[in-house]
Amino acid sequence: MSVEIKTIEQQEKMRIAGKLASEVLDMIGEHVKPGVSTMELDEICNEYIVNTQKTIPANVGYRGFPGTTCTSINHVVCHGIPSEKRLKNGDIVNIDVTVIKDGFHGDTSRMFIAGKTSNQAKKLIDVTYESMCEGIRAVKPGNKLGDIGHAIQKYAEGNYFSVVKEYCGHGIGEIYHDEPQILHYGLPDTGMELSQGMTFTIEPMVNLGGAGVRLLSDGWTVVTKDHSLSAQWEHTILVTSDGFEVLTLAPNESI
C-alpha cells in the first residue's frame, strides 16, 4: 500500500481546504431547526461554497451522488441524500461536507440538533464526539492505525454504544478517498505505522443500539438495522513531527 506523504506546500494547501470546509459547517448551524428540509440546507451550503468561498463542492456528482452535503437524520448512519424531508423537533442530523480548493480536499462533519432532543440522543452525540477525539489523540509518528481504532472503540463501547465497522475514514489530499483506510475499531500496535506528513480523516459512526447497518435501495443511504439512533463526527488530520494537527477544527474547539 502506497500512502502519500504531503510536502510542506501540500500541507499548507490542506490547511486552507480544511478551514474552508469547517467554515461551511460554522455557517449552516443557525439554519438547522425544525421545519427546514435537508434539501434547503444543502442548497444553502452549495450557495456558500460556490458563490462566497469560490471553491468546489466535492460531493456533487461524486460517483453519482446528487447533493453537496450528506445529511443523515436520526437512524441514518451516513451518506443520507438531501431531500424535501423536513426536520422535526428533536431530530439529530449529521451534515458532512467536502470542499476542493486549489486541487486539495477538506472533509469534515458535525452533529446538529433541531430544536431540543432527548438526553439519550445528547449522550450519543457527546460520546461519539469524544470517541473521535480519543482516536485523534492516538495520532503521532510511530503509533499505528490500530491504535486509532482501538481508542475509538474502547471509548464508545465503554459507554455501552456500538461502533459501525462497515465504513471508515480515509487518506485525503488531491484524491478524495485515498489510502490508508482508517478503521474505527481494532487492536493497539497493529496495522500501518503513522508517519509525519500523512493526512487522513477520522470519522466514527456510533449507534445507540446494535452495530448492524443496511444500505437502502438508493445505493447511498445507510441506516441502522434496529432503527436505533446513530451519530457521526469527522475531522481531517495531519500527522506532525510530534503528534497531530486538526485541519478542520471549529472555532473555540480544542482536542
Features from the language model and the residues they span:
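Active-site neighborhoods and metal-handling regions in enzymes and metal-associated proteins
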Residues: 1-255
